A protein has these predicted regions:
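N-terminal start-of-chain detector that recognizes signal peptides
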Residues: 12-18, 78-81, 156-159
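Residue-level recognition of specific faces of alpha-helices
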Residues: 2-5, 96, 136
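RNA substrate-binding interface of SAM-dependent RNA methyltransferases
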Residues: 28, 35, 62, 68-69, ...
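Boundary-proximal intrinsically disordered activation/regulatory segments immediately upstream
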Residues: 1-60, 164-165
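Short, solvent-exposed coil/turn linker segments
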Residues: 7, 46, 80, 116-121
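Short, aromatic/basic amphipathic alpha-helical patches
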Residues: 53-66, 73-79
């Protein structure tokens, strides 16, 4: 359901926790998210990526909830060992599952971090000098690009007004290259 049938709104309020679920796409974004403390719930890999992403799979398996990948009947399936399930499918099946052709070969469902107020963000930063405010930016691509630019420019925090697109939707996360998890 997480990769196929649920809308971004449904993911946000998913049963997993009070915080919901987000989907990170690409090895780089998944690695940044894990490094920033997000909890993976499952990993979906293209079959052709299994060998090249072996380090990522090992890293996910090494996490406290890690699972186990097993090959069977000419394709790879998953066994969850009280951990993170890792699903491996051919490219065409992943495209059919997620509903679009661009997947970068790696998708990871992750527990969504709790939203913080502007006060909570600013109180958590000891030496804030540069703050960007996004107001009324409703396109996920633009929000992701703004987050990526903010990181490149050394902005200390980015505040989004309620009229902005959710910065944790799949497209915004992908375009930000994971910086949405790094810049408060």
């Amino acid at each position: 359901d997480v990769y196929a049938r649920l809308t971004e709104r449904q993911l946000r309020s998913r049963l997993e926790s009070d915080a919901g679920v987000l989907v990170a796409e690409s090895e780089k974004v998944v690695r940044v998210a894990i490094r920033e403390g997000l909890e993976p719930l499952s990993l979906l890999l293209e079959e052709r990526q299994l060998e090249t992403q072996a380090d990522l799979v090992r890293d996910v398996l090494a996490l406290p909830r890690g699972g186990e990948v097993r090959a069977s009947a000419g394709h790879v399936s998953v066994e969850s060992c009280e951990g993170v399930p890792i699903y491996v499918l051919p490219h065409d099946q992943i495209c059919k599952l997620v509903g679009y052709n661009v997947t970068r070969g790696v998708l990871c469902a992750m527990r969504r971090p709790l939203e913080r107020s502007a006060g909570e963000v600013l109180d958590g930063l000891p030496d804030v000098r540069r703050i960007a405010v996004l107001e009324g930016v409703t396109d996920a691509t633009n929000v992701g690009a703004a987050m990526r630019s903010a990181a490149a420019l050394g902005i200390d925090a980015v505040l989004l007004t309620p009229t902005c697109c959710d910065p944790l939707v799949r497209r915004a996360v992908r375009v930000s290259m994971g910086t949405v998890f790094q810049v408060p």
